[in-house]
């Protein structure tokens, strides 16, 4: 771990250090809420599948492997316009303090044809689903995404989401609700959020990008994000509640 950690800038205590050569490290499928029948699940959540451990195989020269090993966590979508997928890791916290998420990521379509296909991936992002520990505390859900392309055109900008969608009941027992907070509507542009991310000239190449996200659990506010060499001040950006 000592050498592997050098590519990150962690806070004082490391809660989770995920090396996917060791397995899924707690990451799994985000299953939509349901009651009594799977048919009661919101249709937009029914498309979610379990992530894969991938060595990034491709047809022209073999396998890329991960950033610094063999396996990466692959969150795959179906080859259908508008499809999406999410992987989730569920943790509770011991102290309401500043937390930091760091990871290296890459995104690309499957190389099924001899075309670059650089606008086939719509977006990639992350979110937290946090519960204020106070008795009357809010559910706070910071959402961040990189909008790579839209309608076949490059966009390449960071966005956030603060508007909560309508909550609907699930089943008949009155115990379960759902809301599609991952929907494509109501995303807002991050100020000065345009960023070009490196993309290679043939469809099988990948490039890894660094991302850091800081959040304060005490105040339940976003603080800062860094992607590669760009740093974004998020202190005035609202989270979904």
Regions found by a protein language model. Give the residues of each.
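Predominantly extracellular/luminal carbohydrate-interaction, adhesion, and secreted-enzyme modules
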Residues: 29-32, 81-82, 235-241
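Beta-strand-rich interaction surfaces with strong enrichment in secreted/lumenal proteins
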Residues: 5-6, 87-93, 195-203
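Secretory/extracellular carbohydrate-interaction modules
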Residues: 64-178
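Ligand-recognition surfaces built from glycine- and aromatic
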Residues: 2-23, 110, 157, 169, ...
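Extracellular glycan-recognition surfaces and repeat-rich motifs
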Residues: 24-74
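Short, solvent-exposed beta-strand-to-loop segments that form ligand-recognition rims
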Residues: 220, 226-241
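Short, aromatic/His-centered strand-loop micro-motif at the edge of beta-sheets
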Residues: 156-212
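Short tryptophan-centered beta-strand motifs in secreted/extracellular beta-sheet-rich domains
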Residues: 101, 207-217, 223-225
């Amino acid at each position: 771990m000592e050498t592997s950690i050098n590519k990150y800038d962690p806070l004082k205590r490391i809660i989770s250090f995920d090396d996917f050569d060791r397995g899924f490290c707690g990451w799994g499928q985000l299953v939509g809420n349901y009651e009594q029948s799977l048919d009661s699940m919101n249709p937009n959540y029914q498309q979610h599948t379990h992530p894969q451990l991938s060595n990034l195989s491709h047809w022209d020269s073999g396998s890329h492997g991960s950033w610094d090993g063999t396996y990466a966590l692959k969150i795959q979508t179906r080859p259908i316009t508008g499809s999406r997928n999410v992987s989730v890791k569920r943790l509770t916290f011991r102290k309401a303090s500043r937390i930091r998420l760091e990871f290296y990521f890459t995104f690309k379509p499957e190389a099924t044809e001899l075309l670059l296909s650089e606008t086939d991936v719509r977006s990639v992002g992350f979110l937290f689903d946090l519960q204020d520990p106070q008795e009357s505390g809010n559910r706070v859900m910071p959402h961040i995404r990189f909008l790579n392309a839209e309608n076949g055109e490059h966009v390449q900008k960071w966005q956030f989401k603060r508007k909560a969608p309508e909550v609907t009941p699930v089943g008949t027992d009155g115990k379960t609700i759902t809301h599609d907070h991952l929907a494509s509507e109501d995303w807002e542009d991050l100020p000065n959020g345009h960023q070009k991310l490196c993309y290679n000239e043939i469809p099988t190449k990948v490039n890894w990008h660094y991302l850091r996200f800081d959040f304060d659990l005490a105040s339940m506010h976003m603080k800062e994000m860094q992607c590669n060499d760009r740093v974004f001040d998020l202190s005035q950006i609202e989270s979904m509640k």
